[in-house]
């Protein structure tokens, strides 16, 4: 999957225009896995326009470490990373949430469902009102081939 200059300009325009209307919560539904049904072709999700392959996940992986995975530290780091993307993560018509979690698990090698089980703040999901966007969650990962990562995540996603 190659990102063209036109796609990048379109993505940046959309992000710029939607920056003022982002959600202040990450829905709990995005943490849960949804079983596939026989109508999978009719329910296919659109590809996420946010390039989660190029994000810097060290904001999570440098703070949330095993074997104990302290909930307060891990959830805070997760919110710092994910809250700037709350609007796209809550869009159930796209695969943004599953894509982001695939990369988080790829880089952090976290146990399945760790953030879903630990990070709960209410019926609307995680509250992002107290999280300020940082440039680190939007930074690119240097020296890593996006194509190799995309293939790896695709293989892992299909295996599990």
From Swiss-Prot:
Expressed in pollen, pollen tubes, sporophytic pistil tissues, in the early stages of female gametophyte development, and in unfertilized, mature ovules. It comes from Arabidopsis thaliana (Mouse-ear cress). It is found in: Cell membrane. Transmembrane segments: none annotated. This is GPI-anchored protein LLG3. The keyword Membrane applies. Disruption phenotype: No aborted seed phenotype and normal production of seed sets. Residues 138-160 form a propeptide. It is a lipid-anchor; GPI-anchor. Glycans are attached at residue 56. Residues 1-23 form the signal peptide. InterPro entries: LORELEI-like. The keyword Transport does not apply. Keywords: Cell membrane, Glycoprotein, GPI-anchor, Lipoprotein, Membrane, Signal. GO terms for biological process: positive regulation of reactive oxygen species biosynthetic process; protein localization to plasma membrane; regulation of pollen tube growth. GO terms for cellular component: plasma membrane; pollen tube; side of membrane. A lipid is attached at residue 137 (GPI-anchor amidated serine).
